[in-house]
């Protein structure tokens, strides 16, 4: 019998399958460790233009170390497939436990709800939202502790990230604002799903469950449900505050953590200390396989990518076509750029030196540089992507984007970073003149 291998992993039986992906049991041949390997069709991601979103979320999830979240170890790729290596959880789905045994006791339901909120809150703090929380995505380890699966992978097609797929798939756990086909806040929508899950754990059945979709949607939209009489008053009160159809007034996770019913027997999870994680495998997996082959052939360096007129229009701050499709308030804050007349290798090496002097690690590949490290408060990961483009024979443009971390911290980084690159950043003559006049005035004062 021929044993199939992917990298150092020996593949076994299929343990899960969806429309666009399958999950196989696999074993690390170097350590003997069992893992779950999610196999995704590369062309599906490219066709649906989801590369950047999935790359970002997988990058962040590789950095996540939380006892209540299934760990993502690494990402491998072939020409046609992307292989996501995940922690293998042996205890099965929480959903199966409910089907087998019926509703849980109040204390057991509360324990799982504690772990659910801890895991969800931690991932939200990293900027990743699940968007498809349900008991089937909650696994149990060998000790019976809850592990949230597919966090950060919800952007993959089979996970139902689109409103259409979610609506047609498992709408029973979905927030009213998601079903309304309007924009929604991922964190607030996840909280609603947590409330439905808590109800199911304690009741053994769904709060919203109708045979026809119009009636189901109507009940979800109005939050028409009732709690069984055996629910404790504290549990009823909390569930009612979570299943608030108005996302603006719905309880937040911070408020859930202060709730009297929630606090009973609550022991915060012990977080795993930050450790440096290399993201090269993630970026390589999502690169164009043709580019990878080209690079491996040892072909001579042809310099930075040259932008054409249309590329420049799209990247221009004065006419950013991307804003037509993304009207988020932070869309312009996360992306910045500058012009330089220096040679590309000088620009790249200068940026590397400055980044390292600011205490960050750098990774360079094909005129792209990733800068990463801890945030200013040392509690989360911070990462920036820089790419050098050729605009004209002696003009380069450096595009800088926030990859992980909040907008305010990114803007502080950008300001400090550019102030240290004065010798390579080109400024228009009138801007240079204004700077000299301003400095002269300040000296006279």
Swiss-Prot record:
The modification Phosphoserine is found at residue 154. Keywords: ATP-binding, Kinase, Manganese, Nucleotide-binding, Phosphoprotein, Serine/threonine-protein kinase, Transferase. One of its GO terms (biological process) is protein phosphorylation. Belongs to the protein kinase superfamily. CAMK Ser/Thr protein kinase family. SNF1 subfamily. Interacts with CBL1 and CBL9. The activation loop within the kinase domain is the target of phosphorylation/activation by upstream protein kinases. The PPI motif mediates the interaction with the ABI (abscisic acid-insensitive) phosphatases. This is CBL-interacting serine/threonine-protein kinase 8. It comes from Arabidopsis thaliana (Mouse-ear cress).
């Amino acid at each position: 019998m021929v044993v199939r291998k992917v990298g150092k992993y020996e593949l076994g039986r299929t343990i899960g399958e969806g429309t666009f992906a399958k999950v196989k049991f696999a074993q690390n041949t170097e350590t003997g460790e069992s893992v779950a390997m999610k196999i995704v069709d590369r062309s599906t991601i490219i066709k649906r233009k989801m590369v950047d979103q999935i790359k970002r979320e997988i990058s962040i999830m590789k950095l996540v170390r939380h006892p209540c979240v299934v760990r993502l170890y690494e990402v491998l790729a072939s020409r046609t497939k992307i292989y996501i290596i995940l922690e293998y959880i042996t205890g099965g789905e929480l959903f199966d436990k409910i089907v087998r045994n019926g509703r849980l006791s109040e204390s057991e339901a509360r324990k799982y709800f504690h772990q659910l909120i801890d895991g969800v809150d931690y991932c939200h703090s990293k900027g990743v939202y699940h968007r498809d929380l349900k008991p089937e995505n909650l696994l149990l380890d060998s000790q019976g502790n809850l592990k949230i699966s597919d966090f950060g992978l919800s952007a993959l097609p089979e996970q139902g990230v689109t409103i259409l797929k979610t609506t047609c798939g498992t709408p029973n756990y979905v927030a009213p604002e998601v079903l309304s086909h309007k924009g929604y806040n991922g964190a607030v929508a996840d909280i609603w799903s947590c409330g439905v899950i808590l109800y199911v754990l304690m009741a053994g059945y769904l709060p919203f469950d109708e045979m026809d979709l119009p009636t189901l949607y109507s009940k979800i939209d109005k939050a028409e449900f009732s709690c069984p009489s055996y629910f404790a008053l504290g549990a009823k009160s909390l569930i009612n505050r979570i299943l608030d159809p108005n996302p603006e007034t719905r309880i937040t996770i911070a408020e859930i953590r202060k709730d009297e019913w929630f606090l009973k027997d609550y022991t915060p999870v012990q977080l795993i200390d930050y450790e440096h994680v290399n993201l090269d495998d993630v970026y390589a997996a999502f690169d164009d396989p043709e580019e990878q082959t080209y690079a491996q052939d040892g072909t001579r360096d042809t310099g930075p990518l040259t932008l054409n007129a249309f590329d420049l229009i799209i990247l221009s701050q004065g006419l950013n076509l991307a804003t037509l499709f993304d009207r988020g308030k932070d869309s312009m804050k996360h992306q910045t750029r500058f012009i330089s007349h220096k040679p590309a290798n000088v620009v790249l090496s200068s940026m590397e030196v400055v980044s390292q002097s600011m205490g960050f690690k750098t990774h360079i590949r094909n005129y792209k540089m990733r800068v990463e490290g801890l945030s200013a408060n040392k509690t989360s990961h911070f990462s920036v992507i820089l790419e050098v483009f050729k605009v004209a024979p002696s003009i380069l443009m450096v595009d800088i984007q926030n990859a992980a971390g909040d907008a305010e911290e990114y803007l502080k980084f950008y300001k400090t970073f550019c102030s240290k690159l004065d010798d390579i950043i080109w400024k228009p003559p009138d801007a240079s003149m204004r700077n000299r006049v301003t400095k002269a005035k300040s000296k006279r004062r």
